[in-house]
Each structure stands twice: as C-alpha cells, then as structure tokens.
Swiss-Prot record:
This is Inorganic phosphate transporter 1-6. The gene is PHT1-6. Belongs to the major facilitator superfamily. Phosphate:H(+) symporter (TC 2.A.1.9) family. It is a multi-pass membrane protein. Optimum pH is 6.0. SUPFAM superfamilies: MFS general substrate transporter (SSF103473).
Amino acid sequence: MGGGGGEQQQLEVLHALDVAKTQWYHFTAIVVAGMGFFTDAYDLFCISLVTKLLGRIYYRVDGSPSPGTLPPHVSASVNGVAFVGTLSGQLFFGWLGDKLGRKRVYGITLMLMVLCSLASALSFGHTPTSVMATLCFFRFWLGFGIGGDYPLSATIMSEYANKKTRGAFIAAVFAMQGFGIITGGLVAILVSASFRAAFPAPPYGEDPVASTPPQADFVWRIILMLGALPAALTYYWRTKMPETARYTALVANNAKQAAADMSKVLQVVEMRNIGNNGGSRRPFGLFSGEFVRRHGLHLVGTSATWLLLDIAFYSQNLFQKDIFSAVGWIPKAATMSALEELFRIARAQTLIALCGTVPGYWFTVALIDVVGRFKIQAVGFFMMTLFMLTLALPYHHWTAPGKNHVGFLLLYGLTFFFANFGPNSTTFIVPAEIFPARLRATCHGISAASGKLGAIVGSFGFLYLAQSPDRSKTEHGYPPGIGVRNSLFLLAACNLLGLLFTFLVPESKGKSLEEMSGDAEAQEEAPPPLQTVL
C-alpha cells in the first residue's frame, strides 16, 4: 500500500484515540502505570527515615555522647546509589522502549523493583561495611528499575490518552508518588510504634547500648520490604496491557494491528478497511540535523528545566533539621531511643508531606488541562524563587530560637506545594507529549536523566555546600561550606534559570501528540471523526 494511504490509516487510528471518551481502562492504566512511582517515592522517603536508625545500629561508638551516625561517604552511597541507578535506567529503558516497544520491556522494570526492594531488606554481611555494600548493590538495581518506569509510564499513558484529558492522566500517574510518600510514612510510623511498644528502650543518654534494642534491625528491613507489595500486586495487569496503538501505527507501521489492540481496551467503532502501512514517512534519528532543527531546543528546554528543578527540589531537605528542631518536633538524638527517633522523624516528615507535598500533585491533575503546562510550570518556578529568597534574605530571623516558627514552616510547605503544583509535575508530563513516537521514550529518558543528575547535585552537592563556614559548627565528617543561607540564594538562582528555560518548551494543552511532534505533518486534513461508543 502506498505511503499516502498508510498515513491516512495511521491518522484514522490516532484520531480515534484523540477523541475517545474517558473510560474505565484509562483509570486502570493510571493505577498500573503509577505503581512504579509509588515504589519510587516510597523507597526514597523511607530510606531517608531509616538512615539514622542504620547509623545507630551499625556505627555506634562506645563512649560517644551522641548516637552513631552513618559516615558521610556511607550516607551518600546509601542514599545516592539509587539515584545513579535511576539515571542509568532512564536512559537505557527509554532507548529500549523505542527500540522494542513499550509493552515488551514494561514488565521488566516492575519485576526489578519488586525483587530489589525485597533484596534490599535482606541485605547481609558480617561487618557494617558489608551490610551497607550489599544494601547499596540492591538499591542500585532498584533504582535501575525505577528509572525505566519514568519514560515508559509517561509514554504509555500519553499514547493511551485522548487529547482533552491527556495532561491530567499523565499527572495522575506521577501523583502516585504522593500515595507512596504517605504510605511510606505511615508504614514507618506503625512499624516503629509497634516495635517501640513491644521492646521498650531507654534514651541514649541513659543507656547507649540498650537504647537500640536488637529487634531494631528488623524494623528498617520490614519498612523497605513492604514497599514491594503494591508493585507486585499490579504485575499481572502490567503484562496484560497491549502495546500502545501509537507505537504500533507510527513505529511498527501496522495500523491494522493498532486498531485491533485499541479495540481490546477502549470502546471505539471498528475502522474501515485498514491494512498495514507502507512505511515510516520521516525516519530521522535522534542525532540527525532534522531532529536538531525541529526538536533540539525542545530537548534542551525539557532537560534543563528538569535538571534545575531537581537541584532545588531535592536540596530542600537541607533545612528540615532547622524546622524540626526549631518547632520542637524532634528533640536531640541523645534524649531518645532509636525507635523513638525513627517514630518522631517519620511523623514529622509525613506531616510536612501531607500538608505541602501531596496537595500540589492533585492541584496539577485538576488544573493542567485547564490552565496549561506552560503557565503552571512558569508560575511554579517563579513562586519557588520568591519563597526561597524570602527564606534566605532574613534567614537568621526565621531560625532565631523561640519565635517565627510558623512563618518558616509555612514558607517551607509552600515551596514544596508550588514545586508539585508546578515544574515537578510538568517536567514529567511535557517530554511525553512533544517528541516523535519513535523517539518519545528516549527523549523522555534523556530529560528525566538530566533531572536525576540535578537530584544528585541537590542532595549531595548542596549537603556539602550548606555546611557552616565555621569548621567547629559543621556536621561530623563534613568540610566547611558556604552555609544554608548562601545555599538558598544559589537555589533561588536555579529556580530563576528554570523559569527562563521554560520558554523553550512549547505548550501542548489540547493538541494531539502528532500535532506536537510533527508525526502527521504532511496530512493537512484530519479524517472524519470516529464516534466512540458510549
């Protein structure tokens, strides 16, 4: 069949997707696709909670006035190795998803997450170093699976959705992170409270050895292990998802199979006389001049905004300790037992997430197809810049003992809110909408990997930068830095740069994927609309 007929058949299939009414399968796909992000957020949230417990269990120093803590290089490895794995997985599975198809590799990422979550909890060794080494090994591969879920889930959801509610559906997949955060916090609270009641222990200051009961070693393992359950429960449905019609029609060049796959899960009228396509019309590659001309600046925009956003977003834990100590939520470590400390940290961070982090996700879901991606991202970057400057300029006013705690807490929560009702959501959504189908997962993976590089810089680069310039006031094992206040000024600058790079990213609200990517550029007239079955 000739190329023109093939393009017409492609467009009939794609137009049917664009005008399909919202159906039950869309919501099923959100849950199935979102489980990877649930696991991602659960793991990232919980590992930050249990690191202090790991320090008490494995790095106690006899005679020390304060509990054991993970050495800086060990803490960086335990927390950061999953980021490195995620970055690698985003690039690898993004490329593989375009090469082999979304469906063929989608189950692999979830199985990696399930198995490595369980294996992380079973980390073993005769010495603290060997336990941490095995934990880091499994956390790398956990991150690798999580990384693969970024481009695949975003691409699959964008290619299943209609153009009217596509943004909300992709945002809802990403918003599963909110459920992961809250679930992680609740699990940590319940497990630590249960063990605390079953195995009472004195504060560290009273009895350093007895303050960490032997059973505490089970606590962090149970918390990490339970994160695998929701993902495992959705594995069957993930393997049953058909290949997306857009991949089959535009990349595999089989419009007939695309129509058949679509009819299995979405109720649309059977299309007329559709056969196989004659071939792909514009087979330019990622490194071609044509791609650079048409999408080069778009890729720079999506990658740079995600990079800058994650530098700022993941660095916000720098001043959590100031908030928690200032408002009295977490007393000094020596006045608590190991399980009491875990309970209090989990409770405080869960409350922050519940009030500041999670609502922003769902504001994005509700408004992204009304307001548009560009406005939400630009306003989010602007507000984050404003709030960080407001925190930085009178920083000593906010952190002075005995006052100003409510204002500091409010600004901190609003910064998280406008990150999630802003660029943290839109940087995930837009790369799945604006690139050609045959490069969509690859470009999303590149953008996401740029973001994860920013997360590494934000989490660890600024952890060193934010140390006090006075060596006597730095945390144990860290060299002097530029201080939290100056770090906040740098982060405000990152947000401002993110706002500027946002202007390189096109608005995709209400437009078809083919219109945004140019996949159907040669076809000036769309086929007559196909009516969906009610």
